[in-house]
Every structure is written in C-alpha cells, then in structure tokens.
Regions:
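Bacterial N-terminal signal peptides
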Residues: 5-16
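Acidic/histidine-rich, surface-exposed loop or edge segments in extracytoplasmic proteins
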Residues: 35-46, 125, 228-231, 364, ...
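An extended, acidic, His-containing surface patch that forms the Zn2+-binding/catalytic region
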Residues: 94-96, 203-205, 261-329, 333-334, ...
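Boundary at the C-terminal end of the N-terminal hydrophobic targeting segment
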Residues: 18-20
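Short amphipathic alpha-helices in soluble, non-transmembrane regions
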Residues: 242, 352-360
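Acidic/His- and Gly-rich active-site-bordering loop/insert found
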Residues: 22-132, 151-160, 339
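Acidic/histidine-rich catalytic neighborhood of metal-dependent amide-processing enzymes
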Residues: 128-129, 135-214
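A short core secondary-structure module
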Residues: 180-181, 232, 237-261
C-alpha cells in the first residue's frame, strides 16, 4: 500500500457516509492529510531559478491516482519538461457546467541566509507553519488538493465537474505562464462556468478577530513605462543648468504630486459599502458616501490618505527604479526611471501615457511603454456564489461582512477573464493584516488558520457543487 493510499484509506474510515444530512465534522485525519500535503508542496523547490513544478505536480498526481481518480482525469501537462502544470477533473453528474479551482505551484525566490528557518522545509513553531509558499500560495493549493481527496474518500457525487488546475509561471522567472498556455493549448481541460482563484481575496484577522472576508471580482491592469532624460554631458567641474538627472528628478516630483481622477466602479462601491461595517465611525461614514454615490472631493481626499483605499479609487503610477550617469566626475548623459502603473479596469493605456506626459511637462523627458497592457474586465457578482461563501464563513467562523474587492495587484485570473471565464478570488486562509509575509522572509501561516481553511474549503465546495438540499 502506498503512503498516499494509506492516508486516503485512513481518511475514508474516519469520515461518515455521503448520505448524511450534515457535512462530516472536521477530523484529525483530514487535518493530518492537509498537513502532509502542505509539507510535500513546501519541500519541493518550485522557484523560477532552480525549482521544478513538474516534480510537485507528479507527486500530487500520484496521490489522486492512488485515491481512485482515472488516469485520464489526472494530467501533468506543459511545453517544458521542468515546469509543468497539474490538471485534475473530479467528475460529477454534469447537471451544471464545471467550476475551475485555480492555484499556482511556483513560488518566488528565497535565500536560506535571510530566513530564520529553511524556507524549503515546513517548520512548525509556536502555532505557525513556516515555509516559502505558505501564504503565496501553496497553502491555498494544499487546501484544494486535500478537499478533493476527502470528497473522493466520501464518495461525494457533485452536480458538476470540479476541475483543479495547479499551474506554473505565475510568479515570473519561467519561460511561460501555465494558465495562458492551458487556455491556448488545452482549453477543453479547464473550460468552466466560472473559476475560484485562491490567489486573491480571503479573510482578514485583526488582533485575532475575524473581521471580514474579501471576494475578488476585478483586478487592476499592470502597465509600465520608462521616462528618459538625455544630455550631451561634459566634465563635472563645469556644471550646466540642463542636467539630465535634475530634469528627470523634476519630472518625477511632479508625477509624485499628481493624483489620477477618482473613478469608483460598482465593485469598489460595493467594497466600501461592506467594509464600512468594520471601520471607525468617521471612516465608515466616508465609505458609505462612496457606496451610495454622495462622496465629494473632501471625502475622497480623506480616504485617499490610506494607500489601500487610494488604490481602489483611482489609477496609480509610481516610480520604482532609477538609473543614470556613467562616471562620478562626468555630467550625466542619461537618466532613466521606470514607472509602474496599476490602471483601473477599462482605462485606456494611451490616455494614461498622455496624462503622464502632460503632468511632467518637460519636452526633454521622453516616455516609452515597456510592456503591452492586458485588459482585465470586471466580472458580474454572482449572488449564488456570494451566498455560498457567506454560508460557509458563518459555518466556520460566524457572521462577518463578505466584501467584493478589486485586486490592486495582478493574478492569473486576468487570462481567464479575457478568455470569457469569470474569476472570483478568495481562499479560506485568514492572515493578520500586520503579518502579510508573502514574498518576504519567514513567510508563515497560523496552523489554526490553515485547519480552518481546510474546513471552509470542504464546506464551500459541497455548496457550489450540489443543490441546497444536499449541500448541508
């Protein structure tokens, strides 16, 4: 008997039958399986430099095959041998179109010297799991894998197929993006009515209290430009007024003091309306004004002092990199800055570029686009999915606001949205607002939070894959 089959058999024995009216109570066997899968994922290096997502995908594929999934429903695919994707189909009755469950296997780089513990060993310490990817985003991936194995052990028959896609290339540093490749080359494997992406949204902890649960329904558009000032230069002992570094510095100063216009979308209005429930009275009043359309310039000015609120309300452009000069005793012949914009959905990149040129107001500083902006359409809020999320959060943690959000960063959901598949981003992991360590040193999650996320994912997937009478 394989190790994977032993765990699944233990799990099956510990869980009540599928015909019970209530979902099975959380069991130690279920959580132990989840811990084992998380450990397995963390301890496979999947960075872009020396890592390998294929190894992680193949190990998980063996677990699914040992659990009774048909070989045709467990596929490790991709254009390269080193960094492939895992796609698993949990077959249902076909009464409804499938739901896609999305996570990525790759992680950002981590240097052992920077960490207290080895980033590629799952370390348990003081109630936390430490390891690269615990927050971003192997923790979320492990909850999906564990839950599908649990449902299989219980012989759960969903009313739609549940498709799991664990992909490569989300963090960059790999020759391709897994979701983009699957849509182009293997669309039938992942085509779905909608997708749940566990790389966005989720719960917020404030001083140990579960305050609210975010559901991502939109994300901003990534677009970078360069600003370059040039000059004939000369000897530094003979300074001139037309200095390339000064010209660029002045342009960046003017850009830094500029705010793009406020344009709250329906998702953003819904976000402020829901988030008001957990804000201080003064902030809550401003949030409600945004939600009901009565906000004035003073309201927006107050909210914009908070970076998160500011980023929800408008397009932002910020200098992120600088280079210039060629010798310490020479006048600079060139100074260049990279400016990263996060545009509101629907914003025209050309219009943003024209605005930057107008704001910097210096013909000696030239703008050039660095990349081609990929549109990110806003998806309609599904009342059935929001109701399921609300019911599942209540079952695990009690009532709290379910808050539609716009992701200020970027996720793989952008490829699916552009392909016509609505994407909603959330996971069951609650992370303290002052302990966000994704991409940082000593990345960690609370073990209790991870166990709760396992229970939440199980409860939610039963709700979205069965009529209400069977879901609970």
């Amino acid at each position: 008997m394989t190790h994977a089959r032993a765990i699944v058999c233990l799990l099956a024995a510990a869980l009540p039958g599928v015909h019970a009216q209530q979902p099975s109570q959380p069991t130690r066997a279920f959580h132990d399986l989840g811990h084992a899968i998380l450990r397995e994922l963390i301890e496979v290096n999947t960075t872009g430099s020396v890592g390998n997502t294929t190894t992680a995908a193949q190990q998980l594929a063996s677990r699914f095959e040992d659990a009774g999934f048909a070989a045709a429903d467990v596929q490790v695919v991709g254009p390269t041998g080193k960094n492939r994707n895992l796609v698993v189909r949990y077959r249902g009755t076909g009464a409804h179109k499938p739901v896609l469950l999305l996570a990525h296997l790759d992680v950002v780089e981590a240097k052992r010297a920077d960490w207290t513990y080895d980033p590629f060993v799952l370390t348990e310490k003081d109630g936390y799991f430490y390891g690269r990817g615990t927050q971003d985003q192997k923790g979320g991936a492990a909850t999906l894998v564990t839950t599908l194995l649990r449902l299989k052990a219980e012989k759960w028959v969903p009313d739609r197929d549940l498709i799991l896609a664990l992909t490569a290339g989300e963090e960059g540093g790999m020759p391709y993006n897994g979701v983009e490749w699957l849509l182009k080359e293997k669309r039938a494997l992942i085509d779905a009515e909608y997708a749940i992406n566990v790389d966005a949204g989720g719960g917020e902890l404030d001083k140990g209290k579960h305050t609210m649960f975010d559901v991502q329904a939109a994300e901003k558009v990534f677009h970078s430009v360069s600003l370059t000032a040039t000059n004939s230069g000369g000897h530094s002992s003979l300074p001139r007024r037309d200095n390339a570094i000064y010209a660029l510095a002045g342009a960046l100063d003017r850009l830094g003091r500029f705010d793009f216009p406020v344009k709250p979308s329906e998702v953003v209005k819904a976000y402020f309306g829901k988030a008001a429930a957990v804000a201080t009275p003064a902030v809550a009043a401003d949030m409600r004004r945004v939600a009901n359309g009565s906000a004035d310039a003073a309201t927006y000015a107050r909210l914009s002092k908070v970076p998160m609120y500011n980023a929800q309300l408008r397009t932002t452009c910020v200098a992120t990199m600088l280079e210039g000069g060629h010798a310490p005793n020479a006048l600079p012949q060139m100074a260049r800055a990279k400016v990263n914009c996060r545009m509101l959905p629907g914003e025209d990149p050309a219009n943003v570029e024209r605005t930057i040129v107008r704001v910097i107001n210096d013909t000696s500083v030239h703008l050039a686009p660095i990349d081609t902006a990929v549109p990110s359409p806003v998806v309609p809020l599904r009342t059935d999915l929001l109701a399921a999320v609300d019911a599942s959060t209540r079952a695990i943690w009690g009532p709290m606001p379910i808050v539609p959000t716009m992701e200020t960063g970027a996720t793989d959901g952008i490829y699916l949205r552009n392909a016509g598949v609505p994407v909603y981003g959330f996971s069951g992991l609650f992370i303290a607002t002052d302990d966000v360590r994704a991409h940082g040193r000593d990345e960690r999650i609370l073990i209790k939070s991870y166990d709760d996320a396992l229970d939440f994912t199980y409860d939610l997937l039963k709700r979205v894959s069965a009529p209400p009478a069977r879901a609970r």
